[in-house]
């Protein structure tokens, strides 16, 4: 230790224990032993005297004030000093550092040579004079007997019979400011010396860190003298203990704990500006860091990662307890520029953790694929179940346990897995199903484990690492998962419960019968969806491949399940009807399940989030196409099953058909004498009841779509039975009764309740026959047409002809321009039709017979059954000779009864003829429906109408009404007359064409001229 520091310590001890001289001597003696300064102790003490002096204050008391020329004599060992006292007030006598002096008082005499001196004087000769003068008999006072800082009054004999009362007080002067302050190194060395000396004299094997007496008094007196805070003192003791040399005597661990506890307790009282605090903290940091290195050396090979058991942390946690207490001191936060042991501890622990993770990563490279997969799975499980204590332990040192370890492990993990996957792909034999299945199970489990690891890593907001892109490692593998899904699910579908093991359908209660194996089938499809959802794909390649594959696999499973149900239902069995129903409903329910949930099953929501628009559109269109194809295939099988089911209901259908085809009388003819004749309404009620029963039974058995398909088969079956039982060549009333008899009877009776009942029944019948809004099936259309009267057929013929003309574009066909409108007559029972013929379009035509053309127009009302020729005239224009562009500009008026004008089928025919010698040749004919004629208006004139001229036999051969009239002509006079009229006209036209062919040569010479 520096000599200046020893001097300061000695001075501090001297001043601190000066009041107890005996104790001071023992303290100084202990000081010389501890610091080994016995050989020059006196020199040190002599140097320290300057730091402590004494002053005696003297003051006269009362009325006996000092007279002039009263002197005080301070007698030392070799010299004497004198000082004249002040008559009033306080006189101070500086004694010096040695109190072993005497004090005398006396009066000064004029003959005394010393009287001429004023103030304080000091000389050896004065001491001699004092000894031999008359003052030698004066009272002598020992300064050492005076108490410090206490006033003492004493009556002083001045000689010559004089005395005075003086009050004297001895004051000690400590010159602390002159003592050099201890530097931290000196204070640290002093502290170390105190504890080492105490440890040497201690009789126990372990040093507990407690200082004995008077060492304890010395240590704390020095600290108190130099105003060193308790916190700095404890910091210094802590640094001494941290670097303690155990070869001298081993330090008890309780010493560190005790100092740490006291250091924490007095931390709040520390003066942050104290000059020793900063160096003390700096040195403590160095010692702590060195201690941390020593503590962590035994743990350098400890496997901190992956976590195994919390017990492994117990030893290191105990070892770092004291260090942690030092690191968490609040005072570190006040000195940001100083190094902090907590940062060093964190970095060292992080190195240990990363080293452990690196060793673990190196071990992954040496493992086989299956072992690697098991290791990664165990890693995930240990992180999930055992990492919490490790996370808490490292978190207290500001270390992200999982994050730091996974960042170090990342490259090893990525390299090991990618190499292993590539090797497995190269070795995979697709011809061995078990090998493929094991490969897919292992890789899928590995994928899920990596997904879980990634989710854990993402929760700690780590920077980008290779694990974030682990899905790309499986780019060539995900397709094998779909193969495995397909094979496994197809096998599971084949093992579902058969219809033979299903039991009776009665067990389903009020629900529609379903096969018991359907639930297993639906669970299988849900399992595929769950597997896909568990993978949580974000890589577009996987999403596209697996989404399309899942839809395809489900469609294949539906086809397999449908084939299974179809083959089982088609077997001969006593409950075949029930089996057919269950199989049909099972196929339909399976299809509906996939159709309604395929977007959810195939993770379309993820597709929309991670896949671009083109790929998403491709997957969507592919899925829709697969589902449509599967639906079509299933409906074919369902249709076949339903056709067999309908065949089992033939008796009911036959009964309905026979009742529909009966004329209402023949069923009662045999019982006429015994029973009353059934009314038409009763017969209809019987038919409806039969329909009710059949429709309700089928509806309760089949799912809606299956029921709809079954109606097609029932309609076909009913049509076949009606065709077998319907009578041919019957009056229209017969067919009308079959088609609309229900409605006519109920309307004529005007029974509202029965009418509503009929509407409900008719709705079921239409549903049963799949007739929507009475639109046609073939049989119903035929019945409808045959129920028409001959008059209605003729009207329908002309109405259809007019509609077809309106809908057809005839291109360059000739036409007639007319203005047409109607006016109601005053009596309002007659309509006046006004037709103004304008012109006709140009016609390139030469009559081959007369070599000329003479066009004229005839206006006729059709049909003739409404407008007979003897009652309705046919206005005719004059022929226009030799004109291919005739213009008539004639106005005609035709009157029509009001009830006929708005009747559909009533029409006006504009016929253009070429006048001939033998017969007028029909050039063309146009038709205008009377109900389409606009009403005349003064505000808005009628527009010109172009009426196309068509051949006479236009649409006759293809018109269904014409063909029906032709068939009915053999038994109906009106139809016969209509057909014969048309036939004669066609014959005349054909005769003209025959004449032209015969005279072709003559006509040719005429043309050549």
UniProtKB/Swiss-Prot annotation:
Q: Which PANTHER family match?
A: UNC-13-4A, ISOFORM B
Q: SUPFAM superfamilies, alphabetically?
A: C2 domain (Calcium/lipid-binding domain, CaLB)
Species source reads: Caenorhabditis elegans
| Name of this protein | C2 domain-containing protein aex-1
Q: What InterPro entries does its record include?
A: C2_dom, C2_domain_sf, UNC-13_domain
Q: Which family does it belong to?
A: Belongs to the unc-13 family.
* Origin organism lineage: Eukaryota, Metazoa, Ecdysozoa, Nematoda, Chromadorea
State the tissue distribution: Expressed in intestine, body wall muscles and some amphid neurons.
Domain spans labelled C2: 812-945
Functional description taken from the UniProt entry: Involved in retrograde signaling from post-synaptic cells to pre-synaptic neurons, probably by regulating vesicle exocytosis in post-synaptic cells. Acts in muscles, to regulate the localization of synaptic vesicle fusion protein unc-13 likely during vesicle exocytosis and thus regulate retrograde signaling at the neuromuscular junction (NMJ). Regulates anterior body muscle contractions (aBOC) and the expulsion steps during the defecation motor program (DMP). Probably by regulating DMP, plays a homeostatic role in the uptake of triglycerides. Regulates locomotion.
Q: Name one GO biological process term.
A: positive regulation of intestinal lipid absorption
**Record keywords:** Exocytosis
GO cellular component terms, A-Z: exocytic vesicle; secretory vesicle
Summarize the record's disruption phenotype note: Severely constipated due to absent or weak anterior body muscle (aBOC) and intestinal contractions during the defecation cycle. Reduced uptake and accumulation of triglycerides. Locomotion defects characterized by mild body thrashing. Partially resistant to paralysis induced by acetylcholine esterase inhibitor aldicarb. Reduced enrichment of unc-13 at presynaptic active sites of neuromuscular junctions.
Q: What domain of life?
A: Eukaryota
